[in-house]
Amino acid sequence: MPATTGSVRRPKTTGLAKGDPAPGVAKVDPIVVIDDVTRRFGGLTAVDVDHLEIPRHAITALIGPNGAGKTTLFNLLCGFDKPNSGTWSFDGTQLSGIPSFKVARMGQVRTFQLTKALSLLTVLENMKLGATKQKGESLLRSIFPFIWRAQDDEIEEKAKELLVRFKLDAKADDYAASLSGGQRKLLEMARALMSDPTLVMLDEPMAGVNPALTQSLLDHILDLKDLGMTVLFVEHDMHMVRHIADWVVVMAEGRVVAEGPPDTVMNEQAVIDAYLGAHQDVDLGVVTGRVRGELDTAALTLLDDIKADEAEAIAAAEEENQ
């Protein structure tokens, strides 16, 4: 299904995988490769990814229920967090142990679910912060404007061009604090482009956005691919994912349970189970005895599973207390 934005239909990218859609399937041209990455918080395993490849020059959606490990995986890939084990690479370069600012300089940038605009700077000043290798960042050089003035003018011109593209040019001299939630999302995306990235990672770009700006954000995400970038984004809106994503990766309980083209993945039982629960057709009130009713085969199977789990937990507790 082509991606639809307004009256314009954009073709989906196909032929991304070397084999049939399945967790860990090899891609024709991967830009990110993840191997045996785990992240634990105490006794909770937040991420446990055996193998995952993100296709280049495509829009990949990372979906899953709350607590699936999506944002944690994002943080690991960007260097904002450290894994307990595993390795991953970006564009052929190993990123394990590389700090986030160096990852960004390599061309992998991200936005956040909660926007990170500096409220007491203007919109234009926020944009200029996104540019890399600024000569004026050196304390000594900052004293001598003739060293950095020409570059600063170029950066400001680029920032203004992006603000026009994202329809924020009228806000250039306003403080970022005055922007709406949707406008802040646009500012974050525009600022990310100041570093000329290869991979743009968006963490729930539609969260908290006014419906009036949703279409604008969708258009800009599709524009990123048209400009030759790779997009990886976290999202809960299944309808939106189906329409703009070329490839979908589904996580549940820290693991990748499915991946493939949107229309294929949305019909997989693993995806339905992840979002609705493996026993979505079973009345749990009947199973637990709180509601009168007849136990069918599915309910009896679930009841047996519950009893087995209880017995296992009791046995483990008794063994620990011995």
Enumerate the language-model features and the residues they cover.
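Glycine-rich phosphate-binding loops of nucleotide-dependent enzymes
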Residues: 2-310, 314-321
